[in-house]
């Protein structure tokens, strides 16, 4: 048996996720595919691909076609499940209970004002877009063999307008 880390889903633990999540995660588990492999097949970033699975990102017609192919799901069924618009932001309780998701929340809670201050000094009065946005997760191993998570956020700077 291969030693693969595979994210699966217990839908009973996530009652706010769309129906498509259960279908996508079941096919992912059945095929033993990582988000990296699925993302490579559909031509998207791993995080963007996972966001489709959690109902937090809109799948294009091309995404649906390629997902149906790689996951072995009927195209018509998948098109029906994924053709609507995402209902973003309601999939996780607030504050988050999952330890990893809570750590991400905690980073913003602890460093949010510091991020804001530095960004304001670099860019002026405004905000970083979470719509014109990309993100990626990488793994780094230091000289001592310790693994480090490298999370990159890249958002368009939107200056406040004067009126």
From Swiss-Prot:
Its EC number is 4.2.1.104. Catalyzes the reaction of cyanate with bicarbonate to produce ammonia and carbon dioxide. It comes from the Eukaryota. It comes from Ajellomyces capsulatus (strain G186AR / H82 / ATCC MYA-2454 / RMSCC 2432) (Darling's disease fungus). One of its GO terms (molecular function) is cyanate hydratase activity. Transmembrane segments: none annotated. One of its GO terms (biological process) is cyanate metabolic process. Keywords: Lyase. NCBIfam families: cynS. It holds the Pfam family Cyanate_lyase. InterPro entries: Cro/C1-type_HTH (IPR001387), Cyanase (IPR008076), Cyanate_lyase_C (IPR003712), Cyanate_lyase_C_sf (IPR036581), Lambda_DNA-bd_dom_sf (IPR010982). This is Cyanate hydratase. The keyword Lyase applies. The active site is at 103, 106, 129. The keyword ATP-binding does not apply. Belongs to the cyanase family. The gene is CYN1. PANTHER family: CYANATE HYDRATASE (PTHR34186:SF2). It catalyses: cyanate + hydrogencarbonate + 3 H(+) = NH4(+) + 2 CO2.
């Amino acid at each position: 048996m291969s030693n693969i880390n595979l994210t699966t889903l217990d839908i009973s633990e996530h009652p706010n996720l769309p129906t498509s999540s259960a279908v996508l995660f079941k096919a992912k588990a059945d095929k033993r595919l990582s988000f990296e492999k699925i993302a490579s097949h559909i031509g998207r970033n791993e995080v963007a691909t996972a966001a489709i699975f959690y109902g937090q990102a809109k799948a294009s017609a091309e995404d649906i076609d390629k997902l149906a192919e790689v996951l072995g799901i009927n195209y018509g069924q998948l098109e029906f499940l994924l053709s609507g618009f995402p209902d973003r932001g309601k999939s996780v309780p607030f504050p988050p209970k999952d330890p990893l998701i809570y750590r991400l929340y905690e980073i913003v809670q602890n460093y949010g004002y510091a991020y804001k201050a530095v960004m304001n000094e670099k860019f002026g009065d405004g905000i970083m877009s979470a719509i014109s946005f990309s993100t990626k997760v990488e793994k780094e191993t230091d000289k001592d063999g310790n693994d480090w998570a490298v999370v990159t956020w890249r958002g368009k700077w939107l200056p406040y307008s004067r009126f």
